[in-house]
Design a protein with these regions (language model features):
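Aromatic-rich, lipid-facing transmembrane alpha helices and their immediate juxtamembrane interface loops
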Residues: 1-291
Length: 291
């Protein structure tokens, strides 16, 4: 199967070279459209695991029988594990990306245990594979964010300018993680954290390669865009009753847009955890310029 995938990849590259040659003869606009197409393809490929998880939630919400011997949540958990095995066996996911998923699964589940215990949200379905009130599939939902960042880093061959020291970003991520717990006890310093995020990552640019040339964008803008898409995904998750907020018990409504800020902070934690695995890939100047 791996050999077949490699052959298909080589064949597609040949087709793309011919398309690129035609696009270059058509002028700047056709080149832009061709590159935009490839940007979308790479983004979709980076979202592979997260997209499959969302598809699972939608499909089981629509078609899973209420009297099935295996609960919906348990099916999603077992299928997520099977997806990971297939992705690793076929080479569609690297061991480093799998390590990211395991790491996120642990940290995400720990936070879920606290949040469900304090009533922040609930999981209305029954399950056998759970810890406390948290079905094990939830760790994979957090892991899909880390998987996306790790895959995007590899696919777009990220480079950075103006990047803060990794040790400083780690301290910021630890403070954010602590605040997710502390805010339930009346200690909420998220606005100070937002200021820290802007100060630390505001000057940073991420350089990414779609095809041959590198493009760049502010890293903070990238964080915000991903946080927005996570918010869209969360609305899908609550709509399919995979989990619910207290205000959604009687009838579903969209998750408040203010939650985008929480997802932005979660993005910082996710990015720092992934960048720990890619720390050697950060340029020496970027690792030591700031602070």
């Amino acid at each position: 199967m791996i050999a077949a995938l490699r052959a298909a990849r080589l064949g597609w590259h040949g087709i793309d070279r011919r398309i690129a040659a035609r696009a270059s003869r058509g002028g700047r606009f056709t080149v832009f459209v061709h590159e935009l197409f490839w940007f979308g393809v790479k983004q979709a490929w980076a979202c592979l695991f997260g997209g499959l998880m969302l598809a699972l939630l939608i499909a089981t919400w629509m078609f899973w029988p209420a009297n099935a011997p295996l609960g919906r949540y348990d099916f999603v958990t077992l299928t997520a594990i099977a997806i990971q095995v297939v992705l690793l066996a076929t080479g569609l996911e690297t061991r480093r990306e799998a390590a990211v998923i395991v790491l996120f699964h642990v940290t995400g589940t720990l936070m879920e245990l606290f949040k469900t215990a304090t009533g922040s949200w609930i999981y209305p379905g029954a399950s056998i594979l759970h810890v406390g009130g948290v079905p094990l599939f939830t760790g994979f939902m957090y892991a899909s964010v880390g998987s996306y960042i790790a895959r995007a880093w590899r696919l777009f061959e990220f480079r950075f300018t103006g990047h803060p020291r990794w040790s400083h970003t780690a301290l910021l991520a630890a403070a954010i993680y602590l605040n997710f717990f502390a805010d339930h006890y009346g200690i909420d310093f998220r606005w100070l954290l937002f200021v820290g995020v802007a100060w630390m990552f505001g000057p940073c640019w991420v350089h990414y390669r779609v095809r041959r040339r590198y493009r760049r964008m502010p890293l903070l803008l990238g964080f915000m865009l991903v946080a927005l898409f996570i918010w869209f995904a969360e609305n899908l998750g609550t709509f399919t009753r995979a989990w619910m907020y207290p205000a959604q018990h009687r009838a579903w409504h969209m998750v408040p847009p203010e939650k985008i800020g929480s997802w932005l902070l979660l993005m910082i934690i996710s990015y720092v955890m992934v960048s720990a695995l890619y720390r050697r890939a950060l340029p020496d100047a970027a690792a030591g310029q700031r602070g």
